Amino acid sequence: METARKSFKTGQGKNNDSVIVIEHVYKKFGTNVVLNDFSLNIQKEENVVVLGKSGSGKSVLIKCIIGLLKPDSGRIEVFGENVPELNHDDLDKIRAKIGFLFQGNALYDSMTVRENLEFPLRRHWIDFSQKEVDALVVEALENVSLAHTIDMMPEELSGGMLKRIALARTMILKPDVILYDEPTTGLDPVTAREIDNLILKLQKKYHTSSIIITHDMNCVKNTADRVALLLNGKCYAEGKYQDFEQSTDKNIKQFFE
């Protein structure tokens, strides 16, 4: 790991297997510095959990990666493209390869489950035939064991089912990278573990890379190939979950005790 940047680093520097490269990113709002020389790389088929307290800048980091916010300085490469420099059309092409699971699920209450899942297909791939769209929707729902909900409304579903539907929609375009924003927040422990297992199952099936933003320690333990601790705007430490558990660093122990 590496902390401050100390050492239990796992050697994840920039290389040909990097799908996301974040280098020396700085972002502030007024006088509030949120990201302060933050650097992190994500490799192919790797789950990296970014751990931090509420308000630490985790969601700001995600928004910078997908181009919703522009960093004040630094570089964010996704699939070899520097996101802050992309125009709208090129940024949209990048986003078509990225799945995003929102903390609040972001399903449309006025749409059926089918219509919610069709939405990203219509937005990014308008040349899909209806037969192809139907097949992708069914596959996505079968992935989360909810094919029977296809014509139901969101209000008819439990919180855990809504999260699984949101995950199905995230995966429907078979993205290369998935960004998860607090995927288990508000769920009971059993349902949260089911979501963790689905994340791992679908990553293995579709060979995706992912960044998981969370402060749920069970989610960290269950899903992380590598953990990055966001503290004071920096990547304070990164390494394996077991390295964090065994660390005597006081800033790390507050999360893992």
Regions found by a protein language model. Give the residues of each.
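Helix-to-loop junction immediately C-terminal to a conserved catalytic motif
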Residues: 66
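Conserved ABC ATPase "signature" region
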Residues: 130-148
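Conserved ABC ATPase signature
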Residues: 153-157, 161
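A short, proline-enriched helix->beta-strand linker immediately N-terminal to the Walker B motif
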Residues: 172-176
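Catalytic Walker B motif of ABC-type/P-loop ATPase nucleotide-binding domains
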Residues: 178-181
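Helix N-cap at the start of a conserved alpha-helix in ABC-type nucleotide-binding domains
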Residues: 189-191
